[in-house]
Amino acid sequence: VPGHRAARRRRPGFPRASTTPGKVRLIRAGLVAACLAWGALAALMVSQHASAAREATATSEPLSLAAQQMYQSLADADVTASTGYLYGRTPPFAYRQRYQRDIAAASADLKAVTAAGGGPAIGASLSTLAADLPVYTGYVEDGQTYNSLGYPAGDSFLEVASEEMHLTLLPAARDVYAYENARLTAASAQATGLPLAVVTLAGGLAVGFAIYRSQRWLSRRTHRTLNVGLLLASAAGAVALIWMAVALLGGRADLLRATGHGSTPAETLAQADIAALQARGDETLNLISRTGDTDFQADFRTAQDQLSTLLSSAEGQSAASAAGSVTAARREASSWFAVNQQAQKLDQAHDYGAETQLVIGQGSGSAGALFTRLEADLDAAIRADQAVFAASAAAGSGAFTGLVAGVAVLALAMAAGCAWGLSRRLAEYR
């Protein structure tokens, strides 16, 4: 009935939108919805940043480190096996022990990376490593056996083993390391990304401005200066925005430091260590072959150039705690390169006895001693940079502790404050 519908529209519980009570109801609904929507967006954004920070610190970085160490252990095992052969039928026990330790470490790191489930992207590389590592160790064992018996076939087995390492195992290990390092880079980039954070903070400011404008409008209509509910909502919003801004900016600064002065220089130094191992392997294989093979010498020069470039880059990237070790590594590398030139002259003169002593001897000026000190300096620098990453990443990840729940509770408090404050005004019209 028309009259009945008109009467219903005039009921106090259903004020028209053009009236003050009707506008208050619309404002209340809009503010509550805006607060809840912003709270959901803020909680989602913070959750993504916190999850990415945890991914970088607790998962990606350890796996990247394991893949890096696996590569280094494999390369060092090959160098150690080759160097031990040069000592004759009874190489020092320390070399045998170091070789076994490298193989055990590489196997353990391979298991750790495989257990993490790298997926199809590196599945083939992991399968190659698992299948071919026993093949490599078999060649080395055969070479060492023949060498201990005085048979010349030992060097052939070691050369085949080295080919297996450089053509199959190390490329597969490099693929695994590149994949895990890319995951670490992606997680760090997501944890330090700004676009969604800026949108969320801007949305919070917009909601806060809407609450402020509603307070002004209500004050003019009701001639009351303050609305307690809206005031509480404003306070909750301010706390949420300040907390988020401080956590995001502080956490981002820590995570950027973890990357810039931790994982990035550590990766550069790891690549330098790999180049050093490559050069040392070429140096010893040149002695084993005793053919004056220019390929080994050319490969040594290539690795030498890579090592020099990487050490120069690391010197500008590393944290202060690693600077001394990086400088020492550059000094040892330069001395090693100079000794290698002397060894090449002895090689050309066919003075293999003096060349062997210069390359594998442990006198203070020998290539062996310089390489050992270079490895120690690189290891110390890598550990120092990794410690910077661990400390800074932990601080960056910790900045998000409790923030997801805190933002959600504060957003609910904002919505409740708006609903309560405006409901009190509506009650005055009934």
Model-predicted regions and their roles:
Residues P2-G3, R9-L26, L196-A240, A247, ...:
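Juxtamembrane interface at the cytosolic side of transmembrane helices
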Residues A34-C35, L41-L44, Q341-Q344, Q348, ...:
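Polytopic transmembrane helical bundles with strong interfacial aromatic enrichment
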Residues A52-S125, L256-A328:
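Membrane-proximal N-terminal soluble sensing/regulatory segments of transmembrane proteins
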Residues L184-V199, F389-V404:
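Membrane-interface helix-start motif
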Residues T268-Q271, L277, G281, S312-Q317, ...:
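Mature extracytoplasmic or organellar-lumen-exposed domains after removal of signal/transit peptides
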